[in-house]
Amino acid sequence: MPQRDSKDLKVLLVEDFEDTRLFMRLELEDQGFIVFEAEDGKVAVDTAIREHPDVILMDLTLPLMDGFAATKLIRQNEQLRNVPIIAVTAHHEDDFRSDAKASGFDAYVTKPIDVNWLKELIAGLLI
């Protein structure tokens, strides 16, 4: 399967800290991604259903609904079931990694994020 160019890929960025969200959005857009944003898990689920992203970058610790619960709900949606979801978090603990895997995340990365490396990870998940 040919690898898609990042310029036509839709990314849902789920991050509750506005400064971090802005920084990541700008970095991703510089890489050519089309970025949609959500500041909590509830908005993330609604946005995923509406926009059908190619990949989701999900913080774990979020208001209203955490990233674990949001991911489980997204995985229940037939059209979104196979969308790669990457946990993007400051948590380095093994418990968070295991919980993320059990919740349906495809990958787990810790902040700070190298956006070039993240682009390669996304490409690998979409093959």
Language-model regions: role of each:
Residues 32-39, 47:
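Short hydrophobic/Thr-rich beta-strand motif most characteristic of the beta2 strand and flanking loop
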Residues 22-30:
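Charged docking surfaces used in two-component/phosphorelay signaling
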Residues 51-57, 62:
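Active-site beta3 strand of CheY-like receiver
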Residues 15:
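Conserved acidic carboxylate
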Residues 63, 81, 93, 112:
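The feature encodes the CheY-like receiver
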Residues 113-122:
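C-terminal output helix
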